[in-house]
């Protein structure tokens, strides 16, 4: 089975919706998507929030159209599963670096970036949950 994970829709809106649908169609058999439950993006402009929401909506509809089961998970839940909690009130960059470090520990042979660490951790969370 295939696990798909997305912690943000930021990459989705950079593509055409048809491209996303074509991509998801490849993985529609025996797949499940773990998708981070998101609210607004604090500190972002209205237009940036709109674009983010549009991409998130396209992703959600693509998953529905392809019949890929989707599990939404809050950041607190998947982060807690790895013993990660931002109790020190780290800056956004410091927190992203913490997530990246954890993803690098779990995936030593992958090229982990600040942009991909959330998705890798959510995917790993999903893999663990699917085994239960």
What are these regions (language model features)?
Residues 71-102:
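Short alpha-helix plus adjacent loop in nuclease-associated cores
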Residues 48-57:
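Charged helix-capping and loop-helix junction motifs
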Residues 41-48, 107-112:
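A short glycine/serine-rich beta->alpha loop
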Residues 99-102, 106-132:
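Acidic, Mg2+-coordinating catalytic module of metal-dependent nucleases/exonucleases
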Residues 29-42, 46, 70-74:
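Short glycine-rich phosphate-binding loop at a beta-alpha junction
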């Amino acid at each position: 089975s295939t696990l798909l994970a997305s912690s943000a829709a930021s990459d989705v809106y950079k593509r055409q919706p048809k491209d996303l649908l074509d991509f998801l169609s490849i993985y529609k058999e025996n797949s499940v998507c773990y998708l981070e439950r998101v609210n607004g993006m604090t500190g972002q402009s209205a237009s940036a929030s709109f674009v983010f929401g549009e991409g998130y909506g396209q992703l959600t509809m693509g998953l529905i159209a392809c019949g890929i089961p989707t599990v939404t998970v809050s950041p607190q839940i998947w982060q807690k599963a790895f013993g990660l909690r931002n109790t020190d009130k780290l800056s956004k960059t410091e927190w992203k670096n913490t997530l990246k470090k954890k993803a690098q520990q779990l995936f030593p042979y992958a090229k982990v970036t600040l942009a991909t660490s959330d998705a890798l951790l959510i995917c790993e969370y999903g893999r663990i949950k699917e085994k239960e």
